[in-house]
């Protein structure tokens, strides 16, 4: 079984298209866990309408009592998941046709428990912007420090290889990048499928849209989370900055 985890917060304009991109994957044994983080718009109503019109889709809406933020929403989804494979998709991003089939076959071929794919930037209307981010066949911890090319909405874990208790998003800024660093430090192998299989929708609410904030977050990860020395932090940061610009040119 594949468990797809989708954190939701005020995504009434986007969540239907995201769900369409999941249900059109054609995976028979799949559950979709939508974790709403106290949305103040009509996201919950839109989701409930979608579930009612797609009764056999395996979609389940989880509404926790308190506010969790993206990290907590994903962690709750992980705890609730029943599948061998855990996939992530943000509630405003989209998967390409057959994304799951291609990636699962790739993971089986490579014997890999942690995989990610290429992706393309899209505008707020989900129109592709023609900029595809290529990914390496494998990525090490040292390489990830300089080029955080792993995009959350492309990631799948095989929990028979990567321990479920190791898949925990920390409650810090850039929690996804922090998790990739943690797993790579522990020796898990991350494999990249260099196919454009996801659309990364750039909305006004994108947490990572502010370049200065992104730079500040990655620097704080180096120094406070990874405890890198100052020289290694500077070296990694220069590489990160170069690659971040290149991804957007």
Where do the language-model regions lie?
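Conserved nucleotide-sugar donor-binding catalytic segment
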Residues: 6, 79, 135-213, 217
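A conserved acidic beta->alpha catalytic loop
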Residues: 21, 36-45, 66, 90
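Conserved donor NDP-sugar-binding/catalytic core segment of glycosyltransferases
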Residues: 98-129
């Amino acid at each position: 079984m594949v468990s797809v985890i989708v954190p939701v917060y005020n995504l009434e304009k986007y969540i239907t298209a995201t769900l369409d991109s999941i249900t059109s994957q054609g995976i028979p044994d799949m559950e979709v866990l939508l974790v709403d983080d106290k949305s103040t718009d009509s996201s919950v109503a839109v989701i409930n309408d979608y579930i009612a019109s797609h009764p056999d889709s395996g979609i389940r809406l989880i509404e926790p009592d308190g506010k969790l933020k993206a990290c907590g929403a994903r962690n709750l989804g992980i705890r609730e998941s029943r599948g061998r494979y855990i996939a992530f998709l943000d509630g405003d991003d989209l998967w390409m046709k057959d994304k799951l089939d291609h990636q699962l076959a790739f993971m089986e071929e490579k014997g890999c428990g942690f995989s990610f794919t290429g992706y393309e930037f899209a505008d707020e209307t989900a129109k592709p912007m023609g900029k595809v981010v290529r990914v390496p066949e494998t990525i090490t911890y040292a390489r990830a420090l300089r080029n955080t090319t792993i995009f959350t909405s492309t990631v799948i874990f095989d929990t028979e290889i990567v321990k479920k208790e190791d898949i925990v998003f920390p409650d810090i800024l850039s929690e996804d990048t922090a998790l990739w660093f943690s797993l790579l430090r522990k020796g898990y192998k991350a494999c990249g499928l260099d196919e454009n299989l996801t659309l990364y929708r750039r909305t006004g609410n994108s947490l990572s849209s502010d370049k200065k904030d992104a730079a500040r977050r990655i620097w704080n990860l180096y120094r406070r989370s990874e405890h890198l020395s100052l020289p290694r932090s500077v070296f990694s940061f220069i590489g990160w900055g170069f690659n971040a610009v290149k991804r957007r040119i």
